[in-house]
Amino acid sequence: MTTQVPKRLRQPIVVVLGHVDHGKTTLLDKIRGTAVVKKEPGEMTQEVGASFVPTSVIEKISEPLKKSFPIKLEIPGLLFIDTPGHELFSNLRKRGGSVADIAILVVDIVEGIQKQTLESIEILKSRKVPFIVAANKIDRINGWKAQDTYSFLESINKQEQRVRDNLDKQVYNLVIQLAEQGFNAERFDRIRDFTKTVAIIPVSAKTGEGIAEVLAILAGLTQNYMKNKLKFAEGPAKGVILEVKELQGLGYTADVVIYEGILRKNDIIVLAGIDGPIVTKVRAILVPRPLQDIKLAKSDLAQIDEVYAASGVKVYAQNLETALAGSPIYVAENNEEVEKYKKIIQEEVSAVRYYNSSVYGIIVKADSLGSLEAIVSSLERRNIPIRLADIGPISKRDITEAEIVAEKAKEYGIIAAFRVKPLSGIEIPEKIKLISDDIIYQLMDNIEKYIEDIKESEKRKTLETIVLPGKIKIIPGYVFRRSDPVIVGVEVLGGIIRPKYGLIKKDGRRVGEVLQIQDNKKSVDRASKGMEVAVSIKGNIMVGRQVEEGEVLYTDVPKEDLQILMEKYKDIVTDDMIEVIKEIIRIKRTQDATYGLGLQFQ
C-alpha cells in the first residue's frame, strides 16, 4: 500500500465534546455506523484514532436536505477524532489554537448545559475552535415518535404540534443558556448568518434523526468559511501526537493526527519527549486494514509509504518511549530545520511545564502536554495558585514541594493527578492531599471542594481563637449582681461578644472578662447586634464604681487579631462591626498610635 491522491482541499478535523452521559460516544458511533451502512466498497478509509467519512457518503445521508441546503461539496469528507471528550481534545493542540477545525458540542436537550459542557465551551473558546451544538435525545421529548429517517426536518414535520412546541421550548432554553456564555445561538434552520450564530441541531443519537443535518452543516460550514485553512499544502508534514502506545512485537508507537502536508516513510521527525526534544526517523506508517467495521479494523495494521493531511496514522520510530502525548510533530528536511523545530518544541513545552518556588500553590501532574495545559488553564480561571505543573508519575520531588506548601498554606498542600500514579515505593504523607481523577471537570470540582473545606475549617478554628469587635450597653435597672462576678443585662449595640472576651471602657481601661452569656436563662456561646442578654463579668469591677448602669463597653481586640480579621476574613465583617472597629481603633490609638494602621474598610 503506497499511495493517496493529493487533494485541493483537505478534510476538516472534527471533535466531539460535551457533558458526561449526554451522548457523545453514542452520537459518534451513530455517525460512524451510519457511514458504514451507506458506503460502497472502497469508499471508507480506515484511520488510527480517527474515522474518515467521505463526501459521497455525506451526500447520500443528507439527500433529503438538498432543497433546504443546496451545496456542492468540494471537501473530500470529514475526519472525526474517534475518542470524544475534552481530555483527548486537549492533545489536539498547536501553537495558538487547535488541530481541530470544528467541534460538535453534545448537549442533552432536556438537561441543558451542565458543568462539563461549560468546561468544554471554555476550552473551545481558549483554542478558538468554532462549534455546532447537537441538542441530543430528542426521542426523550414527551410524545416524540421516531421516524425512519436521518433528517430532523423530515421527522419534525411528522410530529404533533404539541411535540413541536415542546421541542421549541427546550431549544429556546438552550439558546438562553448559550447567551449566558456569550454566544448568539439559534436552531439551524432559522439562521441567516452562520458566521454570527451558533447552530443548534436537534438530534437523536439513538434513532439517527438529525444525523443528516449534523453532517451537512459541518461540511457546509467548514467548506464555506474555512477554505484558506483547509487548502492542502504539499510540504513536509506537521501533526500532533494523540497517544503513545507500546505495540506488541514492534515497540513504542505514536498515534498521530497529520493536519498539514505529507508524511513519508524515512522522514526525519522532531517531537517532544519527557527529557527534551526527540529527533528520530519514521520506520513505518501504519493504518488499519480495510474492514466493514471501523472499530474491528483497528487491531489489524498495514504499512503505507506516505500519508496526506488530514489523516490519523500510527507512526513507528526509535526512541518514542519518552514521547509526550499532545506534542507537536514536525518533519525536518535538513539539520537547520531540525534545530529550528527543536527550539520551537522546547519553547512550547516550557510554556506548559511550570515551576515557581515563590508560589505557595498546588502541584499538578498529568499524562500529556494537552491535558496538563487544559488543567493549568482551568486552575488559572479559578484563581487557584500553581507551584509546579509537569508530566509523568508522582515523584519524591513532588512530595517535597507539596510538603513545603502545606507548611505555609495548608489548603494548597495538594497533588492533583490526572491519569498518573505515584512511582513505585512513593507514599503520600498524611499532611498532603492527593486528588486524582480521569475527568478534568471532576478533578477541578474535587480540588475546589478540598480547598474550600480546608479554608472553612481553618477559618472556624481561627475565629474561635481571636477576639472579634463588639459593643455592649449595660441596661439600666438590670443589675443582678454588682461584683465578683458582676452579672448584668446588656444590649449588644454592634459586632459580637463571646465568653473569655476582655472588655474595655471608652477611655481604654480594661474592666474585666466575659465569663458567661445567657439568653432566656440558657447559656449561649455568643451574642450579636440587637440581642439583649445577661452576662457575667469577672475582674476588678463593681457596678457603681468601675462601671455604671447605662455605660457602653467594648471588646478588647488585640492588634494582631484585628489584622487577621480584616486581612483574611473580611467576608464576615458586617457594617455594624465596621463602625465598632472604627470606635475601638480611636480608643486604642490613645495608647498605641499604630493600632489598626493600613486597614482597608471598603
UniProtKB/Swiss-Prot annotation:
Region feature G5, mapped onto this chain: 204-206
SUPFAM superfamilies cross-referenced by the UniProt entry: Initiation factor IF2/eIF5b, domain 3 (SSF52156), P-loop containing nucleoside triphosphate hydrolases (SSF52540), Translation proteins (SSF50447)
Gene3D superfamilies reported for this sequence: P-loop containing nucleotide triphosphate hydrolases, Translation factors, Translation initiation factor IF- 2, domain 3
Annotated region (G1), positions in chain: 18-25
G4: annotated segments: 136-139
Ranges for region G3: 82-85
Cellular component terms (Gene Ontology): cytoplasm
Pfam families found in the cross-reference section: GTP_EFTU, GTP_EFTU_D4, IF-2
Family annotation (InterPro entries): EFTU-type, P-loop_NTPase, Small_GTP-bd, T_Tr_GTP-bd_dom, TF_aIF-2_arc, TIF_IF2, TIF_IF2_dom3, TIF_IF2_dom3_sf
Cleavable signal peptide: none
Coiled coil spans: none
CDD domains assigned to the protein according to its UniProt record, in alphabetical order: aeIF5B_II, IF2_aeIF5B_IV, IF2_eIF5B
All copies of domain tr-type G, residue ranges: 9-229
Region of interest called G2, as start-end residue ranges on this chain: 43-47
Residues the entry annotates as binding GTP: 18-25, 82-86, 136-139
UniProt entry keywords in alphabetical sequence: GTP-binding, Initiation factor, Nucleotide-binding, Protein biosynthesis
Any one GO molecular function term: GTP binding
Superkingdom assignment: Archaea
Keyword Protein biosynthesis: yes
Function field: Function in general translation initiation by promoting the binding of the formylmethionine-tRNA to ribosomes. Seems to function along with eIF-2.
Family of this protein: Belongs to the TRAFAC class translation factor GTPase superfamily. Classic translation factor GTPase family. IF-2 subfamily.
Annotated NCBIfam families: aIF-2, PRK04004.1, small_GTP
Protein name: Probable translation initiation factor IF-2
Organism: Sulfolobus acidocaldarius (strain ATCC 33909 / DSM 639 / JCM 8929 / NBRC 15157 / NCIMB 11770)
